[in-house]
C-alpha cells in the first residue's frame, strides 16, 4: 500500500497548492465577482490558510518520521476545525426559511466591539447572510466546496500521521 502513497514532501506540496488554489478562487469570487464573504466563510478561509501554512512549512522542512506525523496531526486539526465550520454553514443553508437566524453585524464590527469569545459564539451561531446560497458549482455551494477541501486536507493529514516509518 505504501508504494501508492507519495512521499511526504511532494504530498504536502501538492496539498499546499490545492489550498492555495482554493484561497485564490475565494478571493477571485470576492474581488472580481463581488461575492462578499459572510463570517462563516471567513472562518473557513482561516482554516484553509492554516492548513496551507502547515503544509508549506512541512514541505519546506521535509522532516522524517515523527516530524511527518506531527505535521500530519496539525493538518488534521486544521481540517477538522475548518470542516466543522463548513458543516455548520451547510446546515444553516439547508434550514427552512422560517428557521434561518436574523442577520447580525459584520465580523469587523464584532471584532472591534465584542470580546473574542462572544465573537466566536455569534459567528458559529450563524446569521441570515450565512444561510444565503449566492453561488454554486456542480450542485455544491461554497461551503460544500470548502468541505471538499477540508476532506482532502483530512485525508492528507491522516496519511501523514499513519504512514509507515522509514529508516
Swiss-Prot record:
Q: Which GO terms describe its molecular function?
A: electron transfer activity; protein-disulfide reductase activity
Topological domains (Periplasmic): residue ranges?
29-46, 88-144
Kindly state which keywords UniProt assigns to this record, in alphabetical order.
Answer: Cell inner membrane, Cell membrane, Chaperone, Disulfide bond, Electron transport, Membrane, Oxidoreductase, Redox-active center, Transmembrane, Transmembrane helix, Transport
Query: How does this protein lie in the membrane?
Result: Multi-pass membrane protein
Residue numbers on the Cytoplasmic membrane side: 1-11, 64-70, 164-167
- What top-level branch of life does the organism fall under? Bacteria
Cysteine pairs bridged by disulfides in the record: 38-41, 103-130
Question: What does the entry list under GO cellular component?
Answer: plasma membrane
Picking any one GO biological process from the record gives: protein folding
The UniProt record lists the keyword Disulfide bond? yes
Transmembrane parts of this sequence: 12-28, 47-63, 71-87, 145-163
Q: Which family does it belong to?
A: Belongs to the DsbB family.
Q: What's the name of the protein? A: Disulfide bond formation protein B
Underlying gene: dsbB
